[in-house]
Structures are given as C-alpha cells and as structure tokens.
Amino acid sequence: MPQVQSTVILPPLITSSIFRDDQGRAMIASRRSFARITDAIELPKLIETQIDSFRWFQREGLRELFDEINPIDDFTGKNLELSFSDYEFGEPRYNEFECRERDMTYAAPLRVRVRLKVKTTGEIKESDIFLGDFPLMTNNGTFVINGAERVVVSQLIRSPGVYFKEEKEPTSGRSLHSAKLIPNRGAWLEFETNKRDVLSVKVDRKRKLPVTILIRAVLGLFGDKPLDQCGLNEDVIALFANVDVNRDHQYIASTLDKDPSTNAKEAIMELYKRLRPGDPATVDNARSLLETLLFNARRYDLGKVGRYKLNRNLWEKSRLFEGQEIPSLTMRVLSKADLFKIVERLIDLNNGIGNPDDIDHLGNRRVRTVGELIQTQFRVGLLRMERVIKERMSLQEPEAATPNGLINIRPVVAAMREFFGGSQLSQFMDQTNPLAELTHKRRLSALGPGGLSRDRAGFEVRDVHHSHYGRICPVETPEGPNIGLIGTMSTFARVNEMGFLETPYRRVYREVDNAPLWLERGMTTRDVRHLSTGELIARAGARVDAELAKIIAIGVLNGQLLREDIVNPATGDLIAEAGSEIDRALATKIADLPLRAIKIHPVVTNETDYLPADEEDKFIIAQANALLDERFRFIDPTVSCRHAEDFVQAPIASVDYMDVSPKQVVSVSTALIPFLEHDDANRALMGSNMQRQAVPLLRPDAPIIGTGMEHKAARDSGQVVVARADAVVLSSNSERILVRENDGTERTYPLLKFLRSNQDTCINQRPSVFIGDKIRAGEVIADSSSTQNGELALGQNILVAYMPWEGGNFEDAILVSERLVREDIFTSIHIEKYEVEARDTKLGPEEITRDIPNVGQDSLKNLDERGIIYVGADVQPNDILVGKITPKGETDLTAEERLLRAIFGEKAREVKDSSLRVPNGVKGKVIDVKVFTRDETTEMPVGVNQTVRVMLCQKRKISPGDKMAGRHGNKGVVSRVLPIEDMPFLPDGTPVDIVLNPLAVPSRMNIGQILETHLGWAASRLGFRIATPVFDGARDEDIIKALAESGLPSDAKIDLYDGRTGEKFDNPVTVGYKYMLKLAHLVEDKIHARSTGPYSLVTQQPLGGKAQFGGQRFGEMEVWALEAYGAAYILQEMLTVKSDDVVGRVKTYEAIVKGDPINEAGVPESFKVLIKELQSLGLSVDVLTADERPVELTDSEADDLISLDGINLSGMEKGEL
C-alpha cells in the first residue's frame, strides 16, 4: 500500500539505484527524497497515447473506413458491386535503421481482399489488391519518412455536438441565446434569437430562415399524412406548448408570424429555394435535398462523439425528459426529436432556465490523435479512389471487369504522402535531446486543418481554464503568436475512446454497502478490497450468495469509523454510536441488519477513476496534500477542494475524490523543475521550454537537485535502451549488448554510435551494464547522449556565485571560468550532413572523380582515388568533400581545341567543377562517408546515378556568445571566459565556475534557483543526490537542516576572495551548486562576416542572412546615427560603394587591392530602379546635377564590370557572366 501523508512527518526517504564508476566498480546512486506524499498510482507510459492510437487505426480505424465505403456500385446500380473485406499489413522491406540510412520511408505493404460482384450474372470475383506501402509507427511513437523521423502531433479541436451561447442585445441589455449544431461531417445548423423573439436557422451557412420552416419540413418528411396536411401552425405550437410559456416573449408565435409557409409542402419548397436559389423547385427535389442534407448517413455523420455530446447536452439536461428513450450511440444521423429538443432548449435558455455552454471547457474540446488524423486523410484518398472506380465501372464491360482493372491506388498513396509530408500536424521531430523528443510526442495543437488559426484565435481560447487541471499543463506553452494554442498533456493525463482528456482521481468512500445490497447485486463487478489495507476480500466476477455477501460486508466494514448512529430498524435498539471504530464483532452485527448502506468516516482509497472534464465538474475533489492518518482517513474536518471552477473549503463528508499526485497538474517538462512552487509562472514557462533546447554534452551529468521524474522521462523518451525481459548479460561493449533471457533465448541490443539527430546534435548510446549483471525487464541498460545511469542529464552541476563582477554579468550576461572550457564540461558534439548527387544532365552524366579542373594537388590531399574524402580527415571552410564534374555546354571550338579533341577524343571535352565543398564558417572532422549507387539499390530518384553522403563532426566548447540557462527560466549569454586564477574563490581556495548577477532574481521572481543553489551545495558536501518533487519538495526547514548537517552556514553565504588581488569581497556571497544548461543557440552557428559576396539581381544590394552569405543591413536608425555625428562621407560610402553602386564598388575594390586612392561614388542601382519605376508610370524623369547638367543613366552591362581574382562583384549570376 503506498505511503500517504500523515500527521507524523516522515524523515526524507532514500531511493537508490546501482550504477558503476569509470573503472566498472559498483556504486550506489542515492537520491534523498523530500516528498511527503507518495503517488497513488504509477505514472503511465508517457508515449502510450501515440502508440495506442496508431494500433487502434490498424485494428479498427481501417475496418471502419472500408465498412463506410462498402459497397461501391456503378452509377446505374444495376451492373457491378465492389466491396473491401479483410486486410493485412505485410512485413516492412527495410527496418527503421536502414530506412534512416537510405532516406526511405519505414512502411509496410497494405493488402486488401476485394470482392467484385457482377449483378447481371451473379458471378463473384475475388482478389488481393496491393493498396500501397503504408507508413508504420516505430516503437518510439515516430514515423520515418524519407529518412527523417517525424511526429504526428495530436490536435485539440471543438468536439462535434450542439453548443448554446449567450449574447447581450446591445440596446436593451437582454440576454439572447443561439445554438450551433456541428456534425463530424456534413452541414452545420446555426440557430439564433433576435430581439423581436424570432427564432431563425442557417442551414450550411446559407441565408437565414425562420426555424418553423425547418420544423414544418421535418414534420412533413417523417409524417404519415400528405405534405399539405402536415406541419400546420397548430402542430408546431403544440410541439412546444410545454416550454414556450413566457407570455411576454412568445417565441414560436413570433416566428410563425415571420414564416411565409403554412404547411410542410410550402416549407420544403421554401427551404429548397433558400438553399438552391435559381434551381427549379419541385416537391421531390426539395424532399430529397432535405433527406440527403441532414438524414443521410453518407452525407451527414454526427460521429460517435457527436451523438454522445448531443445526448448529454439535449436529453440528459432536458427538464422535460419524462423517461423518453435516449438515442443510441450507434445512431450517427439526426432524428427529428433532436431538432425539436434543440429548439426546446433554446427557448428554455431565453426564458432564463439552464446555462449556456462554455466552449473553452475541455468537455467541449476533444483530441484527435494520430490514428484518427491518419484515418481522416485515408478517407479522403478512399473517396477519390471510389470516384475513379465508379467511372471505370461505367466504361468497362461488366463481364470483363476485374478488381485489379477497376482500382487505381494512386489517390490513396498520394493522400498518405500529402499527409505525412505536408500536413501542419506531421512535424519534423524535435530531437535536440530526449526531453524534446518526449514532449513533442505529448504535444496538443489547436492549429491545423479543422482547427483554429493563430490570427483569429482570441484571448479566451488561449487562456488557462479550470478544466485543464490534470489534463493540459498550465505552464508549458510556446511564447509568441502560438501561446495557448499549443499545449502539452499533463503527466497523468490520457485520451479516452471518445477523444476527451481524462485525469485520474483516488476514490473517497463516505459510505459502504451492507450485506443486503451485495446480495441484491448478485455479482461483484470489480475486486473488492479493504479500504485502508488493500487486502483482497472477493475477486471480480464472483457470484454473491448470502454467505459471501456477509463476508464482504464484514471485511469492508472492519476497522472503519462510523459517521452516524446505527439503529436496528426492527427493534429501534442502538447498535453503535457515531464515532465508534468498527471491530469484527460489530461488523458482524451490522452485516446482519437489513440496512443497505453504512455511513463511515471518509476513507481515501487507492482505487482510481479516470474522469473527463465534464464528469469531474459534478464532484468535489480534495487536493493531494490533504492530511490523512495511518488508516487513510481525513484528519481535518474540512479540506481544501475544487468543485467545477470554484475552490472551496468543503466538509470531508462531501468529498468524492482526491488528487493522485501533486504533480498531476503539470507536464513532464515542468515536473522536472525543482522548487517549481517558488517560481513565477512566466519564468517556469521559459524554464520548461528551454530544457527542451539543451544540447547533449560530452559527459552527461544528472542533476544533484532533481525532482524524481528524471528516470521516467529518460526511460520513456525512446533514446535509451530498455531491457525487454529479465536476463543475464553475456557481453557488453560500445556497439552491442548480448543477453541471455530467463527462457534461454539470446537477444542482442545494438547501440547507436555517433548518429546525427534531426537538429544536428549527437546521439550516442553507452552501455550501463557489464558481463554477469542480472537485469530486469524495463530496466535501462544503455544510456544515451543526455542520460546518466538511466536519469535525464541535460546539463552540468556547476559551482555558482551570485555577485556582480566588473560589469561582466551586467544584464543577464554570464561570466564563466576557463575550467569549463579546459575540462570540456560544457563541450558538445554536433554532426552535420552534406550530400551530393551525380545526375544525368542534357549534356551528359555528372561524374564523381578526383580529376577536377583547375584544382591544385594540395586541395586533393584528403580525397581517395574516387574523389571522396577520407574518414578521419580534418577539414576547413571551402575544402573539397566530394569531387564532382559537370559537362559544360558545347561552344565554338578554336582550331587548337579542335586539334586536341581529335587527338584525345572526349577527354578534352569541357567540364566545370561542381564539387561539394565545406561551407563558410564550418570546420570539423569527417566521421562517416556513405556512397549509394544505382547498381546496389533501385530506390534512387529518377536521373540520379550516385549519391555520396559525408558526415562532419564538430566539437564545440563553451565560448562567449553561447546561450546558457538554468531550469527556472534564468537565461543569459556568456560574456567572457575568465582564467581560473582570476575567478572569485572560496576560503578553501576552490574557484567558482560561474558568476551570475543577483539582480536577475528579485524582479523575475524565480526564487527556486536560489533554493536549488543552497540545497545543491549541501547535497554536494554530503555526497548524495536529492529528489524534491514539484509542490511536494524540500521546505525551508529541510534546507536549513541540510546546510547544518553539511557544516555550511545557515544563510548559505560565504566570504569570497578576488582571484586577481586575493582580497576578500566586502560582503558574504551566496554560493552553491546549480544545474546549468547549454542551449542550442550557439554563437558558432550565428556569427558571420562578409567582405564581398552575392547581390540581389534587381536592386544590386547585398543579400541578407548567413545562409545567403549576406551583408549586415544598415537601416534607417543606423543612418540617423551617422547623420547625428555628421559623418557625411561614411554615410555616402554606406549608400553607394558598400551597397549598390555597381561600377563604383568594383573600382573601389580594385583601388584597395592596388593601393590607389578611392574614386568618387557613382549612382546607386536602387536610384536607377526608382527612375525606371517612375518611367513605368508614364512619367518623364530627368536627373540633373547641382549645376543643372543632365546625368546619363546607363544600365551596367556585365562586360563593363571588372572581376578581380575570381571574385564576382557584379551581382550577375555565374551563368550570366
């Protein structure tokens, strides 16, 4: 039975796990937990939503689609009928790893059994049809599409159903209500009330019409009388006589006054005219339109969810329910009763009865998981294929038709390719570190097809809502335009079969069933356990006779406290008083009484119920920190609870449920922030987001101050290797782990070595078990780049001091010690991929070769005989990685060239150098080279003969300009790397590693970082790691006790000495160990310099951005600065020769090279463009000098421009020069 908070404060628990040091010796990694509350249930598998959803699609989702489309008849319906029956997924041709290597899609062939019936002869033809390769989900919840891992993000959208909304009428201030009926597929119905009490409806967003027209039409459609005798005024008034009772506002009467029709026939015709203006209206046409629009299952589908919401909102909330039969969940189309109920409820709301719906409530928003999103897209492909099949059926002879001849799979394959390659919800996986990967799979997006757009989304939909509690994290969301539209599932949240988010709660028993009630039930529906001890009394499914009913009642009652007197109803004798503890003898007496239920002092059990948001609103729910005694009974008479959107202090007798854990409200990323409860929410948001940007470091180091979530997050991320079964390790090396499982089978776990992630970080797995070790199923046996001993390790534990230092940490700048550089503490590995293809061109095939024209031997020194760089070569910017030549266009040959051609044949043919070179600003070591040729694989794109892929690895040390952050949203940029001897040092001579500015703390209100620093210092002295879970972590007194235990001052401040002078600083300084991250915003990726380079073809101004090797924009405000200083010549230079004076910049460059004086600037190209634009408007523009002489503006011809040393300063592209 899990331990729950009691009146006795427990000492901090020690949780241990075995790991080994660098020499292979077994060590104990202990985390002292300051948690006082133990989670009632274990955390679920964090990526189960993705995996379960895709399995549902494979098992049921596809079956539903084929049932939906079956059967497909030809246009006449008399000749052919085609239907899909069983289907199966074959084995994938390549495994995930091979697909990543070959840039292919990890997919399995989908085969379907198709049955074609020739109706004229009765002949049935069956065959198995290949429906294309269907992308498969990996065990980690991802898809490999064209070699790249992608994630399909779950979408949070408005659920199908009916929604009632309140709006104030501006002139009178009266509340008027409207309703929207949203199906899963089909026409929307929008009902409105105007200030004159007229109810109107819009069908499929067309023109408004009185709602009585629709009511009359529906009465006629389902009536058994002729149309002109149905839907009369008295019929309509009688329908709503029970609800339209307000004499001041007669809604139906007012609407009938505005209704031009008088019976069902006229109403159907009127409806047709409004929906199909211009089409000739006949009764049959009008009737069939209404039927197909709202009552045909192929055109109108509420879906299971739509029907469920409709039943909840209309039937269960109806005050005039009177035992009417609720429509079944399988009834996916509208009924006439549904429409009448909507109008009834609308009139009730207008009369002040009932409440409108809250559209932002999670009971009204559902999650479309990956399986449903794929199903929706697959449906699109199937419907396109159905159209093709019908067309082919009409063209072919029925007897000659075959399933293969009718089916064209291209629409289905294209729909799937379009979804996985181009959908807003199919995203390139964030693989920066394991946490980024895990969080991406748990993300919820309100954007995408059928969702919101970020421009139109208002404040309400983005805001935190009370129904998010335990379902969507209130902290983790992006900053910027997507704030509130993209969220993350909370730690314990799951998606139910309807798509609604659920969260678990512990059941609170306020009364227990007595023997007569158990006997009446006849069978146990679930295991019956003792409420406090969890001891099993009866198993689920047991038949209950009189004897077992008594045993169960005694077993459950034993040990409970009575909440009211027990009186024998037959004699009136008092059996027991309120407050008595029930022993076995008293329990036996009570079980013999004819009482059905016994009220007891509320007991919190470990039975958990997962509740969706609308169900939760009915109950009173206590917080996880409510005080309980050793028998799990509430100690206080009232406890702090939630009830719908209110926080109440409720008597314990009214509590229904209790939270399972303090961290159930937040997401995984937020649950990794220690002392979260001491941080401002804005900073916690930044902390959650920045942890996902942490770059994996060379030597991962798990945090000294953790939250206890590190192990679970690492294990479920998909980047570590987890044992599948209990086993013994036979061998363990850097490449694989071989184990023998308990049943004797041997299994090999291959390890990933220095692989490139989607974000160019390094994925490298290291074994954490050794020969002879016994491992258990689910245990982490190999660490990844950002894990240590199976725990998440995103950063490093660093000794920090909070003090200003000569302006070196002004405005969030960070001063770091050279030790971090020298000892590779914040060094990360980055791997970049460079690829070149040899294609067939019109002038002949390209060739990968070492024989490159106009290239010296020095540039070829690292190339092998094929012209491909060696593995292990160190390369610099502009070095050749792969030599490639491309045929040039034939030109008129001179006599000498013709002679050479005659002597040497094709060898003298002109080729140009198109080699793959290292880009500017990149250097590193080649760690892998792969060559793919058409001979080996047929999967290459058309026209490609050979592909060469080179992997380049860089080791990046921490340097000024790199962004660093803590877990509390405290971010900054490294300003300076200071020699170790200059850093401030402790009295024992230990220099600090980082100096942070104390002014960064008070205004940001993220005090968690200070508490982490204090406790980290104490824990590092005591030699253990700490778990301080969110909302249940170390208190102030715990930190003071830990500081005292480790012999540190109680204020955690100490005298520091200046490393440069050895003098003591004036005041004691806060010092301690803090977990710091290096983020994926590295200065090496951002720093950029240019002298000359490419120019825009139209304006001739330098291009912008590092990717284009562009210049730095000298904008309006910078011009003001030069103007303010009166620097006229610098300003002229900026606007002319440094920008778009084409001839001037070439001449200036030449003058600098030759050491000549620089000539005067010419006319900028942008000025010429302006003149041309004015001339295009029909204006004659002349340019005059100061003395009114005309200036000749000529176009700069390519031939007039000088190009020095092969540098093209003209802005003309290479092919044009």
UniProtKB/Swiss-Prot annotation:
The keyword Hydrolase is assigned to this record: no
Broad EC category: transferase
Listed GO CC annotations: DNA-directed RNA polymerase complex
Keyword flag Translocase: no
Domain of life according to the entry: Bacteria
GO molecular function per UniProt: DNA binding; DNA-directed RNA polymerase activity; ribonucleoside binding
Reactions this protein catalyses: RNA(n) + a ribonucleoside 5'-triphosphate = RNA(n+1) + diphosphate
Keyword set, alphabetical order: DNA-directed RNA polymerase, Nucleotidyltransferase, Transcription, Transferase
EC code(s) of this entry: 2.7.7.6
InterPro entries per record: DNA-dir_RNA_pol_bsu_ext_1_sf, DNA-dir_RNA_pol_bsu_external_1, DNA-dir_RNA_pol_su2, DNA-dir_RNAP_su2_dom, DNA-dir_RNAP_su2_hyb_sf, RNA_pol_bsu_bac, RNA_pol_bsu_CS, RNA_pol_bsu_protrusion
Annotated GO biological process: DNA-templated transcription
Subunit-structure text: The RNAP catalytic core consists of 2 alpha, 1 beta, 1 beta' and 1 omega subunit. When a sigma factor is associated with the core the holoenzyme is formed, which can initiate transcription.
Described purpose of this protein according to its UniProt entry: DNA-dependent RNA polymerase catalyzes the transcription of DNA into RNA using the four ribonucleoside triphosphates as substrates.
PANTHER family linked to this entry: DNA-DIRECTED RNA POLYMERASE I SUBUNIT 2
Family to which the UniProt record says this protein belongs: Belongs to the RNA polymerase beta chain family.
Listed name of the protein: DNA-directed RNA polymerase subunit beta
Species whose genome carries this gene: Herpetosiphon aurantiacus (strain ATCC 23779 / DSM 785 / 114-95)
Gene name of this polypeptide: rpoB
